[in-house]
C-alpha cells in the first residue's frame, strides 16, 4: 500500500495562528503538489473556511480549490492529487460526503497512491474506520457511521488528559473512550492538541 496521509488533531493550538503549529509538516506534505482540493463540508460557512485555508497555505505557493464550488465533485476528486478535509462537525461532514457519494472514490484513490489525504480534526475522524470516536454532537444524521478506513484504528482528536476538578461531574475523555472500548475491540489513538499522524505507506509516525 502507498497511502500518503497527514492527520492533524486540530487546526489551531492556543497562542498560534490557524495551521501554524504544523506548518513544517504541512509544507513537506504539500511539496510535490501544486493544487489543494479542499473539502469544507464540516462547517456552515464554507466560503469563509476555504478563504481561511487559502490564506494559511499561501506560503506554500499552492492553489486552493473548494470542492463545494466545483460542478462535479467526483470528477474533481478523480483528477486531484491532494485532498484536504477540514475540521468542524464530523457528522455534518460525513452526511455531506455520503450524499455526494465521495467516500468510496476517495478511499480507492488514496489506497492506490493516487491521492494524498490531509485531514484536520473532523477530517481526521473521517480517515478512521468509523466516526464513533469523534467528540462532536450529532447535529445531523449521516446514512452510516462508516468512514474511510485509511488507518486500521480509531482516533480521538483533541484528546485531553483528565484534570483534577472535583466539581466536574461529567464524563472525562478517557471515560468516554472506555465506554467505546466496552463495546468494541478496537485500538483508539487519543491525539492531543497540536499533534499529527503521518502515514507513508505502511509507516506511521506520531509527531507534534
Model-assigned labels for residue ranges:
Residues 1-86:
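N-terminal beta1-alpha1 cap of cysteine-dependent amidohydrolase-like domains
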Amino acid at each position: 500500500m502507498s497511502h500518503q496521509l497527514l492527520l492533524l488533531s486540530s487546526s489551531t493550538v492556543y497562542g498560534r495562528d490557524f495551521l501554524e503549529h504544523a506548518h513544517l509538516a504541512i509544507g513537506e506534505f504539500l511539496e510535490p503538489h501544486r493544487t489543494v482540493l479542499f473539502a469544507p463540508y464540516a462547517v456552515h460557512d464554507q466560503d469563509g473556511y476555504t478563504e481561511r485555508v487559502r490564506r494559511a497555505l499561501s506560503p506554500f505557493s499552492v492553489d486552493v480549490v473548494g470542492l463545494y464550488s466545483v460542478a462535479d465533485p467526483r470528477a474533481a476528486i478523480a483528477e486531484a492529487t491532494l485532498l484536504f478535509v477540514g475540521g468542524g462537525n464530523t457528522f455534518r461532514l460525513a452526511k455531506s460526503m455520503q450524499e455526494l457519494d465521495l467516500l468510496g472514490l476517495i478511499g480507492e484513490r488514496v489506497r492506490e497512491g493516487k491521492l494524498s489525504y490531509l485531514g484536520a480534526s473532523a477530517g481526521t475522524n473521517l480517515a478512521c474506520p468509523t466516526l464513533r470516536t469523534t467528540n462532536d454532537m450529532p447535529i445531523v444524521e449521516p446514512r452510516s457511521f462508516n468512514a474511510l478506513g485509511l488507518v486500521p484504528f480509531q482516533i480521538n482528536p483533541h484528546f485531553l488528559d483528565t484534570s483534577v476538578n472535583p466539581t466536574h461531574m461529567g464524563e472525562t475523555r478517557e471515560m468516554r473512550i472506555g465506554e467505546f472500548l466496552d463495546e468494541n475491540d478496537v485500538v483508539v489513538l487519543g491525539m492531543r492538541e497540536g499533534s499529527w499522524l503521518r502515514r507513508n505507506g505502511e509507516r506511521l509516525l506520531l509527531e507534534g
